[in-house]
Amino acid sequence: MRQIAFYGKGGIGKSTTQQNTMAAMAEMGKKVMIVGCDPKADSTRLILHSKAQTSVIQLAAEKGSVEDLELDEVLVEGQWGIKCVESGGPEPAVGCAGRGVITSINYLEEAGAYEDLDFVTYDVLGDVVCGGFAMPIRQGKAQEIYIVTSGEMMAMYAANNIARGVLKYAHSGGVRLGGLICNSRNTDREDELIMELARRLNTQMIHFIPRNNVVQHAELRRMTVIEYDPKNSQADQYRELARKIVDNDMKTIPTPITMDELEELLIEFGIMQQEDESIIAKAAAVA
């Protein structure tokens, strides 16, 4: 069994990418479980065709404790037999959502949820790098990390931060970076830029997913593209990514870069202009 995690900046399309990719894996005959580690609890909605799966934390609150839960209450089987779990989290501004991740994974292990699987995937909130959300990395639960990013500066910034987290636990937990997944935003020279970022982080751009409105059309129906329009070229993109992950033998210890180096990379690719420091943060009319 391989345990992998998808990290990425909020809004980058991480959950969508993860669900479509896991759907493609299941289509290939792989036995898959998705563990959602995001308080939004939207990591399984396209597989289950539901708004949001009831989370472990929510069910535990209703029952009194995690120990009172039955596995079939928290683990729901969706399309293609994909097993789905949402860890969930507390109400906004109350408590630590990362604790939900820790509690859920520990419960799933004790309840025997990991038996007879080819892949377990963790869908993790990526721009908050607190200890709870880093738990799949920190305790060696996920051995392979895939970072969903794009050619936008903040998505790249988050990717670099996540790489820094992987590096921190690479020697103690054995976790490795499997690659960057570029979920295209149609920015200038995006594929070249992410390939170069990957090179500097000592990894690969494992796949470039082109932008396609069919993804949104499928999401509105709470479906993966694989199910909604299986013959669409976008469905083939997710199938190709799934095959690349299955066959991936390039798992590395990342080499994060500094913020200055990231800005230099953007300047090198013409995304940012190298301007006189005196006009930085000045409006166009003032400059």
From Swiss-Prot:
PTM section of the record: The reversible ADP-ribosylation of Arg-99 inactivates the nitrogenase reductase and regulates nitrogenase activity.
Modified residues (ADP-ribosylarginine): 99
Organism (species): Frankia sp. (strain FaC1)
PANTHER family listed in its UniProt record: LIGHT-INDEPENDENT PROTOCHLOROPHYLLIDE REDUCTASE IRON-SULFUR ATP-BINDING PROTEIN
Reactions catalysed according to its record: N2 + 8 reduced [2Fe-2S]-[ferredoxin] + 16 ATP + 16 H2O = H2 + 8 oxidized [2Fe-2S]-[ferredoxin] + 2 NH4(+) + 16 ADP + 16 phosphate + 6 H(+)
EC number assigned by the record: 1.18.6.1
InterPro entries: NifH/chlL_CS, NifH/frxC, Nitrogenase_Fe_NifH, P-loop_NTPase
Family matches, as SUPFAM superfamilies: P-loop containing nucleoside triphosphate hydrolases
Protein family per UniProt: Belongs to the NifH/BchL/ChlL family.
SUBUNIT field: Homodimer.
The record's free-text note on cofactor binding: Binds 1 [4Fe-4S] cluster per dimer.
Enzyme category, top tier: oxidoreductase
BP terms from Gene Ontology: nitrogen fixation
Highest taxon listed in the record's lineage: Bacteria
Key words, A-Z: 4Fe-4S, ADP-ribosylation, ATP-binding, Iron, Iron-sulfur, Metal-binding, Nitrogen fixation, Nucleotide-binding, Oxidoreductase
Full protein name: Nitrogenase iron protein
GO molecular function annotations of the record: 4 iron, 4 sulfur cluster binding; ATP binding; metal ion binding; nitrogenase activity
Purpose: The key enzymatic reactions in nitrogen fixation are catalyzed by the nitrogenase complex, which has 2 components: the iron protein and the molybdenum-iron protein.
Positions that bind ATP: 8-15
Cofactor (UniProt): [4Fe-4S] cluster
Binding site for [4Fe-4S] cluster: 96, 130
